[in-house]
């Protein structure tokens, strides 16, 4: 009988002080959860900014690669009438004496020196 009274008194004391600590524990848990969410949010924001920076770098690299691998636009060869289309490479669109009088248009020729 004495042991039952001791256990019951311990039970009452434990429940009384347990309830008092429960409110403190809940507040601490709320603070911990808020801090974790805050840290997760900051980590997510840092990851998003890093992702945006990587995407910007990737887009510039892809543009450079596309420019490097792209074909030369269509152009006209030597001794071909030019007008709408540009002449290839080192050729220039000039009026010449040889073909100009017949076709009445400039031709792609090598530029004259001098």
Curated annotation (Swiss-Prot):
Main location: secreted
Sample GO molecular function, one term: toxin activity
Pfam families: Toxin_22
Domain of life: Eukaryota
Positions of the propeptide removed during maturation: 21-74
Keyword Secreted belongs to the record: yes
Disulphide bonds in the chain: 75-88, 82-93, 87-108
InterPro entries: Toxin_22
Tissue specificity comment: Expressed by the venom gland.
Stretch forming the signal peptide: 1-20
Localization annotation: Secreted
GO cellular component: extracellular region
Keywords attached to this entry: Cleavage on pair of basic residues, Disulfide bond, Ion channel impairing toxin, Knottin, Secreted, Signal, Toxin
Swiss-Prot/TrEMBL domain comment: The presence of a 'disulfide through disulfide knot' structurally defines this protein as a knottin.
Family: Belongs to the neurotoxin 14 (magi-1) family. 03 (ICK-30-40) subfamily.
Physiological role: Ion channel inhibitor.
Name of this chain's protein: U17-barytoxin-Tl1d
